[in-house]
Regions:
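Active-site/ligand-binding-proximal alpha/beta "capping" segment
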Residues: 156-206, 211
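Glycine/small-residue-rich loop that forms an oxyanion/phosphate-binding "nest" at active or ligand-binding sites
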Residues: 47-75
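Boundary-proximal intrinsically disordered activation/regulatory segments immediately upstream
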Residues: 1-46, 117-119
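Glycine- and other small-residue-rich loops at beta-strand/loop junctions that grip anionic moieties
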Residues: 27, 89-90, 114-115, 140, ...
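Structured adenosyl-cofactor binding patch, chiefly the S-adenosyl-L-methionine
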Residues: 66, 103-109, 117-134, 189-228
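Short, hydrophobic beta-strand segments that form beta-sheet elements in well-ordered domains
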Residues: 26-34, 42-47, 138-140, 154-159, ...
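RNA substrate-binding interface of SAM-dependent RNA methyltransferases
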Residues: 72-73, 77-161
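Amphipathic alpha-helical repeat scaffolds
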Residues: 31, 92-100, 208-214
Length: 228
């Protein structure tokens, strides 16, 4: 029928769950500011009060909700498209993942997400990215050690963020680089640290830094190496 939306509110509401997002390869982005960052038109937009009551992922809807196709790339595509990558290993908080994506966008990097990390398309991840999900290449569901082997073979330096390491962010090399960051508390497993050539710590008065803060510091340091 003419005028029938391509994606109904009922179908869109199912995209709040990972199961249905994966089945449809679609996700939700919410709010005018985030939708305004999208370089592609959404497949469907919901804006009426009744539609938002069904589709919004928030108790108090913050604006229109758009439906978009998945954006992630393969590991090979990621490594071919950027010179700096942050690998998030086992970072399960979607807010941290989204904020790290935002930092990667700011500093011209890409993001690699290991298996067990927060879902790239979780509404909280999308929201925390503040639209950077549309501008940042992200590969997901990766085996970290396998990804590092591929990155090393492609000429990337491999750095592990380890709290007790003697190296500091200022010692990061220039050139192509993968920075590996684990979850706050558990950190990186030994096999990931062993796969890296460099270990760097971040001097701090706090016992630990969350993953997104660590990512921001290290990505800035790597970015500053290529500034004129």
């Amino acid at each position: 029928m003419p005028g029938t939306p391509a994606i109904s509110p009922k179908r869109a509401a199912r995209l709040k769950t990972k199961k249905h997002r994966e089945a449809e390869r679609l996700f939700l982005a919410e709010g005018a500011a985030i939708l305004g960052e999208a370089p592609i038109a959404p497949l469907q937009v919901f804006a009426s009060v009744e539609q938002l009551r069904r589709v919004s992922t928030l108790k108090t809807p913050s604006g229109p909700v758009g439906v978009f196709p998945f954006l992630d790339v393969t590991a090979t595509q990621l490594l071919a498209s950027v010179r700096r990558v942050v690998l998030l290993h086992g970072v399960q908080d979607p807010g941290n993942v989204g904020t790290a994506i935002r930092s990667a966008h700011a500093f011209g990097a890409g993001v690699a997400l290991s298996r067990g990390s927060a879902d790239l398309y979780n509404p909280k991840t999308v929201r925390a990215s503040m639209g950077s999900i549309f501008h940042t290449p992200v590969a997901r569901e990766l085996e970290s050690v396998d990804f590092l082997a591929e990155a090393g073979g492609a000429g990337f330096g491999l750095d592990a963020a380890v709290p007790e390491a003697r190296g500091t962010p200022g010692s990061l090399p220039g050139g192509r680089l993968v920075v590996c960051i684990g979850a706050e508390g558990s950190g990186l497993p030994e096999e990931v640290v062993r796969a890296c050539e460099i270990q760097v710590g971040i001097p701090s008065l706090a016992p630990s830094l969350n993953a997104s803060v660590a990512a921001s510091i290290l990505l800035y340091e790597a970015y500053s190496r290529v500034l004129p």
